[in-house]
């Protein structure tokens, strides 16, 4: 599979309609392609819209452009550390309001996302 096909498969979204526009958008930031794809599928299967980033720089750009409702960060982001990326997002007025959740192994992803989504209501 080419890099473009992989990125296209990873950047999935619920079907566009008047109803889906209001669905929460989650940005998954993770350098591991299999992890990004797995988490993306978990969330889209539950109705979330999803976009993905592979690096800290890409996370900052996509967060600024798409203004997701939540950013999930896992592992290393390659060019920037998770801490540096989070700090830059927190300092930017356009992205400072977006919750950032750092994922850790052993916890169920969807449970944590649903908990954050419920708390935001």
Q: Whereabouts are the PLM-identified features?
A:
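Non-catalytic signal-transmission and effector/linker regions of two-component phosphorelay proteins
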Residues: 1-32, 93-94, 106-121
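His-Asp phosphorelay/catalytic-motif detector in bacterial-type signaling
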Residues: 23, 67, 93-101
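Short beta-strand elements of ligand-binding domains
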Residues: 30, 74, 99-105
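Two-component/phosphorelay signaling modules centered on CheY-like receiver
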Residues: 33-51
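Acidic, metal-coordinating helix/loop segments flanking the phosphotransfer/catalytic sites
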Residues: 52-70
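Short amphipathic alpha-helix used as the core "switch/output" element in two-component signaling
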Residues: 61, 83-96
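Conserved phosphotransfer microenvironments
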Residues: 73-89, 105, 109-112
């Amino acid at each position: 599979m080419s890099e473009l096909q992989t990125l296209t498969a990873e950047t999935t979204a619920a079907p566009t309609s008047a109803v889906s526009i209001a669905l929460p958008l989650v940005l998954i930031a993770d350098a591991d392609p299999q992890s990004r794809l797995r988490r993306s599928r978990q969330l889209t299967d539950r109705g979330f819209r999803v976009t993905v980033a592979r690096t800290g720089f890409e996370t900052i750009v996509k967060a600024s452009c798409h203004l997701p409702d939540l950013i999930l960060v896992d592992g290393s982001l390659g060019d920037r550390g998770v801490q540096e990326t989070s700090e830059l997002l927190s300092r930017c007025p356009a992205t400072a309001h977006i919750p950032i959740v750092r994922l850790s192994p052993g916890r169920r992803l969807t449970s944590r996302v649903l908990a954050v989504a419920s708390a935001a209501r």
